[in-house]
Amino acid sequence: MRFSIFSTLLVSLATLSTAAELGIEKTHEVECTRKTVKGDTVQMHYKGTLQSDGSEFDSSYKRNSPLKFKVGSGMVIKGWDEGLLDMCIGEKRTLTIPPEYGYGSRGVGPIPGGATLIFETELVGIDGVSKDEL
């Protein structure tokens, strides 16, 4: 009986982890030799919407000002720290970010708790990387 309960628990946990996967879709691919790595300071343009109703909650395009941050340092949500690795300058991706990789159950501002987020992203630059390194 214990084995049966334990097996059921493992299957349930496996299902939960599958449901919480980060979605990464390359929408505009670019060839390069220098891709983003943890620790890079990057400039990203983005538009963020809620998966539930498509409402936009933020856009760097509207401000005409890309967001600058260090990848993998926790300055942004986990979905960005993981979903923006191995990108080339000029590449575009759509990230589908479950709550576990976003703002969790607490939400923030116009983003409700438990929200799955959709980000259309574009890598504009990597600090210290010149055009001839690409």
Curated annotation (Swiss-Prot):
Gene Ontology CC entries for this record: endoplasmic reticulum
Reactions this protein catalyses: [protein]-peptidylproline (omega=180) = [protein]-peptidylproline (omega=0)
Enzyme class of the recorded protein, top EC level: isomerase
Cell location: Endoplasmic reticulum
Recorded superkingdom: Eukaryota
Record's signal peptide: 1-19
Any GO BP annotation: chaperone-mediated protein folding
Single Gene Ontology MF annotation: peptidyl-prolyl cis-trans isomerase activity
Keywords in alphabetical order: Endoplasmic reticulum, Isomerase, Rotamase, Signal
PROSITE patterns linked to this entry: ER_TARGET (PS00014), FKBP_PPIASE (PS50059)
Activation/inhibition comment: Inhibited by both FK506 and rapamycin.
Short motif Prevents secretion from ER, span: 131-134
Domain PPIase FKBP-type: 39-127
EC number of the protein: 5.2.1.8
Function noted in UniProt: PPIases accelerate the folding of proteins. It catalyzes the cis-trans isomerization of proline imidic peptide bonds in oligopeptides.
Family: Belongs to the FKBP-type PPIase family. FKBP2 subfamily.
The protein's name in its UniProt record: FK506-binding protein 2
Organism: Aspergillus oryzae (strain ATCC 42149 / RIB 40)
Gene: fpr2
